[in-house]
């Protein structure tokens, strides 16, 4: 039974009325899930044109709330246990984990502010494994590990007219 690592607190209503619900979930290896500080969803919302412009910060599966990967990284990096949601009559107004406050749409969705992809931000897994990198490369940074091979089907279109690895969206 998968359980979110974040604790959700809300003021002004029940966020489950407004968050996107998914019918099923595919988790990581149980051993990994049990030994990490955070678990985040990596789901995208379907778009008619296939371009990813927005991302939910909180999703729902099996009547339980889960943060998306980006929000969970912020929470864990800030050494917080809680995610707070402020709601009004129309839905979610703000999502926060101290000291960060993020305004969202009523469904907890934010618009992604893309920037031009910078290859210098990448390092191959092979180089890490072989120790062929500057140790300072990872210092004081959030690190995402992902695959970018076309056959893995984790490439997404952005409003900038480019296709990027899905991990870069987070």
Which residues make up each language-model segment?
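Non-transmembrane functional regions of envelope-associated proteins
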Residues: 1-100, 138-170
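Short amphipathic alpha-helices and their capping/turn segments at secondary-structure boundaries
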Residues: 130-139
């Amino acid at each position: 039974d998968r359980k979110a690592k974040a604790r959700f607190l809300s003021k002004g209503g029940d966020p489950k009325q407004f968050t996107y619900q998914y019918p099923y979930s595919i988790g990581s290896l149980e051993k990994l899930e049990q030994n990490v500080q955070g678990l985040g969803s990596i789901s995208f919302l379907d778009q008619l044109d296939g371009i990813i412009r927005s991302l939910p910060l909180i999703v729902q599966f099996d009547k339980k709330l889960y943060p998306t990967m980006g929000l969970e990284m912020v929470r864990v990096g800030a050494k917080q246990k809680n995610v707070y949601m402020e709601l009004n009559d129309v839905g979610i107004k703000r999502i926060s984990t101290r000291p960060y406050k993020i305004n969202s749409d009523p469904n907890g969705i934010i618009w992604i502010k893309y920037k031009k992809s910078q290859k210098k931000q990448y390092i191959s897994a092979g180089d890490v494994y072989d120790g062929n990198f500057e140790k300072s490369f990872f210092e004081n940074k959030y690190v995402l590990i992902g695959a970018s091979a076309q056959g893995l089907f984790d490439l997404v279109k952005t409003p900038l007219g480019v296709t990027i690895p899905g991990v870069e969206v987070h």
